[in-house]
A protein has these predicted regions:
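Domain-level signature for soluble enzymes in the chorismate/prephenate branch of the shikimate pathway
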Residues: 1-314
């Protein structure tokens, strides 16, 4: 049975995303849940996102499901940093989850809410709601959205910012549902494993790499040019410190397309020649187009092919 690592305890948004991935047949070796509802995988619960990726690296898990980007807070930096260093890992699938929080309390609680347990990322997305509805409550940090529910269930907080799944698992009452300060809050989760053949190209794919560049004038522009001259749509460019020397950075790039698309393949080869290091994070389906797909065989390519095979290059 495949082992899948994710941030615990049970009931986190990551688990919700993973269950949706399983339901859509996106996890290798795991079929959608049968009628008895039993999951076709063994959960490996960890106390952090880097911990979930470490479980894949050290063989305790076959895959990890981790958040990588949030529409409110931006990139999930612990995920990026963990993917960029250590033994290589590869992304095989992604799922975008609409995020809204459930405010939970213990059954029968009727007194004032003096303390609210909240995961810091969740707190940033419900501050206005808490200020309007629970202005006198003190926030108690929790290690995850599901952990906030456990804090409430075990009597260490009067209320918690959590998930509907965690409320059900812990037997808690719902004080408020679908709570979020910004409408359309969404988080993108990815399924990560050890390096292997990528999923087949679908026409709606994403490719991600991490670049390390020499500290030279125009180095970053030159790398970007490899995409622009091939009409490849870059959807994310982000820098992170290397943590090895002050002022040195690595660059995360996402583009539309698959490594088996000729323009993307040519761009990756050019980056390999040009950059100090290129870490390939994978090519995987996005389900729907996230931008302009790379161009197909163009007139210039047909012209060159004609010269090569002797059929003429006119």
């Amino acid at each position: 049975v495949p082992r899948i690592a994710y941030l615990g305890p049970e009931g986190t948004f990551t688990e919700v995303a993973l269950l949706q991935m399983v339901g859509r047949d996106m996890v290798p070796g795991v079929r959608p849940a049968p009628a008895d509802g039993k999951a076709g995988f063994t959960p490996v619960l960890t106390d952090s996102t880097p911990g979930a990726l470490a479980a894949v690296r050290d063989g305790r898990a076959d895959h990890a499901c981790v958040p990588i980007e949030n529409s409110i807070e931006g990139s999930v930096l612990p995920t990026l940093d963990s993917l960029a260093v250590g033994e290589p890992l590869q992304i095989y699938a992604e799922l975008v989850l609409d995020v809204a929080f459930t405010i939970v309390t213990r059954p029968g609680h009727t007194g004032p809410v003096r303390t609210v347990a909240a995961f810091p990322v969740a707190l940033a997305q419900v501050r206005r709601w808490l200020a309007a509805h629970l202005p006198d409550a003190t926030v108690v940090p929790a290690t995850s959205n599901a952990a906030a529910a456990h804090e409430v269930a075990e009597g260490r907080a009067d209320a918690g910012v959590s998930t509907q799944l965690a409320a059900q698992r812990c037997g808690l009452d719902v004080l408020a549902a679908d709570v979020v300060d910004e409408a359309n809050a969404r988080t993108r989760f990815v399924l990560v494993g050890t390096p292997g053949a990528p999923p087949p190209a679908t026409g709606a794919d994403r490719t991600s790499v991490v670049l390390r560049l020499d500290n030279a004038p125009g180095a970053l522009v030159s790398a970007m040019t490899e995409f622009s001259v091939r009409d490849i749509d870059l959807t994310r460019i982000e820098s992170r410190p290397t943590r090895t020397e002050l002022g040195t950075y690595m660059f995360f790039l996402d583009c539309i397309g698959h490594i088996n698309d000729d323009p993307v393949a040519e761009a990756l080869k050019a980056l390999h020649r040009r950059c100090t290091d290129v870490r390939y994070l994978g090519s995987w389906p996005t389900g729907s187009s996230a931008g302009a797909p790379p161009p197909r065989l163009d007139e210039a390519t047909r012209w060159l092919a004609g010269l090569r095979d002797g059929t003429g290059g006119s």
